[in-house]
Structure formats: C-alpha cells, structure tokens
A protein has these predicted regions:
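A membrane-interface helix-boundary motif in multi-pass transporters
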Residues: 187-209
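Small/hydrophobic positions within alpha-helical transmembrane segments
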Residues: 30, 78, 82, 110, ...
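A late C-terminal transmembrane helix in Major Facilitator Superfamily
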Residues: 143, 157-193
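C-terminal transmembrane helical hairpin of 12-TM major facilitator-type secondary transporters
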Residues: 34, 70-83, 88-153
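Membrane-interface helix caps of multi-pass small-molecule transporters
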Residues: 88, 92, 96-97, 183, ...
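Multi-pass alpha-helical transporter architecture, strongest
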Residues: 175, 207-227
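Extracytoplasmic gate region of multi-pass secondary transporters
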Residues: 13-91, 151, 178-185
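Juxtamembrane helix-start elements in MFS-like secondary transporters
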Residues: 55-76, 100, 128, 132, ...
Length: 227
C-alpha cells in the first residue's frame, strides 16, 4: 500500500457537518467529563465516608488523615487498575461486536446503574463503602474504555483513511472535558443546598449526563443502521 494524498484527503468541514460525528463527540465528551468530575472529588468522598466509621469517629483531624491515607492510596491504585482493565476489556469486547456503539451503550448503562445505586442507598451519607467503591471503580473502567474504543468507532462510520483526522477532531472533546469536568464538580459541591451532603449532590448530575450520553450514542447507532 502506498499513501496517496489525493485519494486519502478528507475534508474536515465535511466531517463536522455530519450529525454522526457530533453524536460521537457529545458521548465521548460527557464520558470524560463525568470521569474527571468524579476523580476530582474522589478523595473527599472517601474522606466523608470513612469519617462515619466508628473506629475513626473520635480521632483528631490530623490523626484521622494519617489513619486513612493508606486506604485512600490503595483505592486510588485500584482505580488505576480498573481504568487499565476498562481500556483493555472494553476494546476487546468491541472487537467481537458488529456495532461498535454497543460498547458505549454498555459503559453508559453500567455508569447509570452504579450512580442510581448511590442515589437510592444514599451510600455517601450512610457510609456504604462497598457501594461507593463500586461506583468509583466502574465509572473509572468506563472512563478508560470509552477512550480505547474510540478509533474503531470512528473507523466504522468514517473509514480507515479518515481515522487520523476524525480522531484528532474528536479528541477536542477531551480538551473541553479537561476544562469542564473538575469545574462542574466543584460548582455542584460548592452550591449544594445541603452542605452536609454536598458530595452526594454530584451523583444525580452525573447520572443525568450519562443518560444524555446514552441517548446520543444510541442515535449514532440508529443513524449507522439506517446507512
């Protein structure tokens, strides 16, 4: 195979005019935004949950911070494992599926489910560590998986010759998510009506965003099936 600039050229304007591109862009942007929003508050969420444990109730702030530092460090390390596993696992799953959008649907449904679990159990307020960890680990897995499966999704809709261009354009969503994810979380936490449960207020917002992402990627799949 020899690279031919004439036949391999793709117009960026043409790509940007396609609804399918924007459906993918929105879904990718939301997945990264939610992942960054949760990661940015992860230590504080764990801090609040662990503070409710009886063995830590009477400790001074300094002793409490020292006592839980190892636990938080371990959780962050396991987070990285789930992020890596999500990248490998979801990309492997996508190789066995006819429609690549299905992987994103699985990621978003999984993320919605674990967020709803927090809402219905009030896991942060009730110090249900297992439920909080399930949310942190699975959302992190989806965060990594959404990134690793993006190229094959773009290949499916725009062709192999355009992957570099479409991938570059879609990665602009990562840049915007980097600007908005942490700020979104900080805004929601700072303006929560009940400051005693300020971190729990973030979860319904993430749930709503994941629903929008699921709708967006489902529309992409619908348009792809029509074509």
């Amino acid at each position: 195979w020899v690279y031919d600039p004439a036949t391999s050229h793709v117009s960026r304007k043409t790509i940007l005019k396609k609804p399918v591109f924007w459906g993918i862009w929105i879904a990718f942007y939301i997945n990264i935004t939610c992942g960054l929003a949760l990661i940015s508050q992860e230590k504080d969420i764990l801090h609040d949950v662990l503070r409710a444990f009886p063995q830590y109730a009477n400790l001074s702030p300094a002793k409490f911070a020292a006592a839980i530092s190892g636990i938080i460090g371990l959780v962050l390390a396991v987070d990285s494992v789930f992020n890596t596993a999500g990248r490998v696992g979801f990309s492997t799953l996508s190789d066995h599926l006819k429609r690549r959008e299905t992987v994103y649907q699985v990621i978003f449904i999984m993320s919605i489910a674990v967020c709803l679990l927090q809402i219905f159990t009030n896991s942060i307020g009730n110090a249900l560590l297992w439920a909080v960890l399930a949310m942190l680990f699975l959302v992190n897995a989806g965060y990594g998986g959404g990134f690793s499966t993006l190229p094959v999704l773009l290949d499916q809709h725009f062709g192999t010759k355009t992957v570099s261009t479409t991938h570059g354009l879609t990665l602009s969503a990562w840049a915007f998510a980097g600007l908005s994810g942490n700020q979104l979380a900080s805004f929601v936490v700072a303006h929560a009506p009940d400051q005693a449960h300020r971190y729990a207020a973030l979860i319904p917002v993430l749930t709503g965003l994941f629903v929008v992402a699921l709708i967006s990627i489902s529309l992409v799949k619908y348009l792809g099936d029509r074509n």
